[in-house]
């Protein structure tokens, strides 16, 4: 882990594992939904109200729609797959940059904002962010026999849901 946030999350995972109890820990990335505070909602608002915005283009990852993660957890419970234990990575399929994600949000929302790519150095944040944070999801797919939605498909669903909520 790059910073305190990542290290403390890892320490928490290690403490749960050391307890000896069965556990399922899901690591995810770029989590978004139609509620709360997240990149999706920020971009939906900014692209609706600004003619141009800058978005980081040199960090790669995979957006995760909270609905998809909740669906996985519900599936595990309903199918009684609770005999497994461990840490699992879960995010949407595919890879994109924040710039790509923002551009797709802008497009799906029907907004005309001009999105300009920039480097991480041009957009300082309190915590250092990795340039590549794509998760290996082979274990979760294998152990639970699932297919993971492509991030663009999940985004399209999220936008439809968002539009229905704001009407």
Task: Identify the residue ranges that each predicted region occupies.
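A hydrophobic C-terminal alpha-helical subdomain
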Residues: 122-143
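Mid/C-terminal beta-alpha module of Rossmann-like enzyme folds, strongest
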Residues: 79-126, 166-167
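Catalytic tyrosine of NAD(P)H-dependent dehydrogenase/reductases that use a Tyr as the general acid/base
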Residues: 2-5, 58
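Substrate-binding strand-loop-helix patch
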Residues: 34-35, 59-70, 90-108, 157
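Amphipathic terminal alpha-helices
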Residues: 151-167
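NAD(P)-dependent short-chain dehydrogenase/reductase
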Residues: 14-61, 67-75
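Active-site helix of classical SDR
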Residues: 8
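Short aromatic/basic micro-patch
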Residues: 25, 61-63, 95, 117, ...
């Amino acid at each position: 882990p790059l910073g305190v946030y990542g290290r403390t999350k890892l320490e928490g995972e290690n403490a749960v594992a050391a307890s000896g109890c069965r556990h399922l820990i899901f690591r995810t990335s770029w989590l978004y939904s139609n509620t709360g505070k997240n990149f999706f909602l920020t971009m939906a608002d900014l692209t609706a109200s600004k003619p141009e915005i800058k978005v980081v283009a040199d960090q790669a990852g995979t957006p995760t729609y909270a609905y998809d993660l909740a669906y996985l957890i519900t599936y595990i419970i309903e199918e009684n797959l609770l005999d497994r234990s461990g840490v699992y990575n879960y995010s949407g399929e595919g890879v994109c940059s924040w710039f790509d994600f923002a551009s797709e949000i802008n497009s799906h929302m029907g907004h005309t904002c001009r999105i300009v790519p920039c480097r991480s150095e041009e957009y300082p944040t309190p915590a250092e962010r990795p340039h590549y944070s794509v998760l290996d999801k082979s274990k979760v797919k294998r152990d639970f026999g699932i297919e993971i939605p492509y991030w663009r498909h999940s985004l399209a669903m999220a936008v439809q849901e968002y539009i229905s909520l704001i009407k």
